[in-house]
Amino acid sequence: MKKVLCIAECCCDLIFAGMPGIPGLGEEIYGSDFVIKPGGGANTPISLSLLGTPVSMLTALGDDDMGRQIGQTLKKSGVRLWGRQHRPGTRTAVSAVMSTDTDRCFASYGGTGGLDWDILETAIAQADIVQTYLGYCRQQPIARLCEKHGKMLCVDANYADVRDREAALAALPGIDYLKVNEQEAVCLSGCEDAEAALSFLGSRTKCGVIVTRGSRGGIAMDHGKRYAFPAVNMGKFRDACGAGDNFAAGFLYGISQGKTFPQALESGSRLAGLAVTWYGGNDQTLNCTKLDTMF
């Protein structure tokens, strides 16, 4: 099985689950549950590792209780950490997540850490597949180092990454696979719809692009061939937080096992469907047997 390196910052998710609505200014609303879990960039490597994939992560955890709690969960999950952790005075990013039956919203603090970019090449050289985010590819020589060492580069994006279209598009030729949601695809491509965006973006990466569409599944392109995949209902919906991160984990799980592109898409769709049955973007009950049984 191929080794995966994830490059991302982590945050601590404070999840107010089962909210009947979102409070306005001066209002207070009670949810049915409350959970604290690692979030952000931690979701993909945790799920990958729980599925049995060898995973390491270049990240930075703060010198506080939340940073130490995230570190314990990552290590418990089997994720190897690259970089200096808990440096004196650093603070962990935090997101308060208010989750309703249909969607969620966030109030976040960005933290004061920073990744140890001086060890970037060493970390990349020891992996087979590198997973990171478009913003990092714009700022650091990740694509160049992956090319130098012959590593596959799979990149996720968020809306903030794609708003600067010129800079984001300039990064695409160094990327093997780009994963975006429908809104991000339209924004980045400048096209009117997801289908046109798929063709536009797919022609600018090395291998292809995946466009996720929530409950409508998604569309993808690999070496010029179009694919469509459905959303998969894996149980009672609880929380949409981390569905995209887990699609990425499922896709990478498939690729690391040598599955075909459409098989890897199916793995991603099924793990995303499973993720929305949890509160938060990861769950320690996940294992390979559980996912394979659901296949």
Explain the meaning of each model-derived region.
Residues 51, 90-92, 214:
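Short, basic and Ser/Thr-rich N-terminal targeting/leader segments
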Residues 32-39, 65, 87, 91, ...:
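Residues at secondary-structure transition points
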Residues 4-5, 194-295:
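Conserved phosphate-binding/catalytic region of the ribokinase-like
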Residues 15, 107, 188, 275, ...:
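Residues that scaffold the ATP/ADP-binding catalytic core of kinase and kinase-like folds
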Residues 1-60, 65-69, 76, 237:
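Glycine-rich phosphate/adenosyl-contacting loop at the front of the ribokinase-like
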Residues 1-11, 72-86, 98-227:
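Ribokinase/PfkB-type carbohydrate-kinase core domain
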